[in-house]
Amino acid sequence: MRKIAIYGKGGIGKSTTTQNTVAGLAEMGKRVMVVGCDPKADSTRLLLGGLSQRTVLDTLREEGEDVDLDDIVSPGFANTLCTESGGPEPGVGCAGRGIITSINLLEQLGAFKEEKKLDYTFYDVLGDVVCGGFAMPIREGKAQEIYIVVSGEMMAMYAANNICKGIVKYADAGGVRLGGLICNSRKVDNEDKLILALAERLGTQMIHFVPRDNQVQRAELMRKTVIEFSPEHPQADEYRALANKIDQNQMFVVPKPLSIEELEKLLVDHGIMN
């Protein structure tokens, strides 16, 4: 089983990209589990047809320790398995700690056992590596591969660079590696060249450039992935291509993060200044 974590700046489109990619893998016949590591609990909504799923932490609060796997894992599109860690009540506790609790419980209940015949587990992780809890999939070897969703905007690239620093920090202990950058286009000038240059400087690859298309929003309004909502649409093929590239990927590296000055120079050389 391949264990993958998707990181990136908040609002970059991680959950949408993850769910559409997972739909592409599931369509290929892969058995995939998605673990939402975000207090918003929106990492599996499109795979579940918009059904709001009771989170692991909510279930623990309501049921106590007497929890079955079926209480927290739901079947989604094309035999995917979906679970959401959730978070603490607003203003109380630590959401990162909730991720640790949730993943540990899933392991105790046998969610990742061999008899489940999983090909992939995807961890969709909130925002930047803001604290130890959110870094947990990297830190404790829960994820082997990291893909960073990025765009040509400065803050998205800054977050990607920070995440690379987290990967470097835990590469020896957890054995985690960077699989590549996924450019989720914001239609910034020279965006593809900019992210290709960033990937090269980090020592990785831009594994796929996902063009911006309103079909993604249309599908989301219908609470579906593009692959389920409009399987013949060119945007569905973009996510299939990304899924296939991840499936075939052999390039796993310890990245080489840039200084803030190097990052700004990259933007000047390749970005909107030209």
Curated annotation (Swiss-Prot):
The reversible ADP-ribosylation of Arg-97 inactivates the nitrogenase reductase and regulates nitrogenase activity. One of its GO terms (biological process) is nitrogen fixation. Its EC number is 1.18.6.1. It is an enzyme of class 1 (oxidoreductase). Pfam families: Fer4_NifH. It comes from Megalodesulfovibrio gigas (Desulfovibrio gigas). This is Nitrogenase iron protein. PROSITE patterns: NIFH_FRXC_1, NIFH_FRXC_2, NIFH_FRXC_3.
